[in-house]
Amino acid sequence: MPSPSPLARRMAETPPRRRFGFVMLLAGLALVLGAIGYLGYIGWFGGPVYRLVPAARAAPPRERGVAAVFLSGDSGANTGMAPHLIQAIADRGMPVLAINSLTAFAHRRTPEQARMLIVEATRRALALPGVQRVVLVGQSFGADMLQFGVATMPASLRPRIVQVILAVPGDSLVFKATPGGFLDGPPDRAALPSARSIDWLPVTCIHGTQEENSLCPLLHAHNVRRVTLPGDHYLHHDAAALSATIWQAIRRGG
């Protein structure tokens, strides 16, 4: 029978109280390392801002030549509902240029930098082979930044944008993303002024019945279509319902 290792012998000789403390220390260290690894995975420490998800099949005739730009929420494009929403659009035949908002806004951006990110993403999508027009989709924090950027979209790009889809946008803007918004701090400005100025294309605004700080109920312009889903800001985490609603908006053309 093999003899116990030095570490095993030492643990056996350690009083139970100290042994428990040592085990708890190891468990705490494992939790910290796990949390750091998770934050790295979702993109808080850096990584690609853009990810292209090709269409999984041929697009329906009406959507041919159209790509989607998708801005994730503040938990990034690799977790939560975002990956399901992105893949659902691609599975229906539309390529998606996904933006990891957590990575893009991990450091506070100026309003002008936020605007330029939306412009750059639009141009990137339009430069993809075969793409002639784009649909712009934002989720939560991504919806906030999207509407702010679209409000001042250059005139040269406007004719090539089919519509804007805002999923659970808030009534305030913060130009910095932290996981789940826990470290965001106070809002930088109200969301309504920029959102109200988007009067040149169709806008679909999706919100939950129990949301308390939603932008959607504040929008009454003729070009805005509001859609209400069950739940609060997280919509009961029902990615299938939200992805179906987004695709219905895409098929409607606004």
Predicted segment positions?
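Short, surface-exposed "cap/lid" segments of acyl-processing enzymes
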Residues: F45-M94, A98-L102
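The feature captures the conserved acid-bearing segment of alpha/beta-hydrolase catalytic domains
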Residues: V168-P169, L173-V227, G231
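Hydrophobic membrane-insertion alpha-helices, especially the h-region
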Residues: G21-L39
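Alpha/beta-hydrolase active-site loop
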Residues: H107-P129, V135-L136, D144-F148
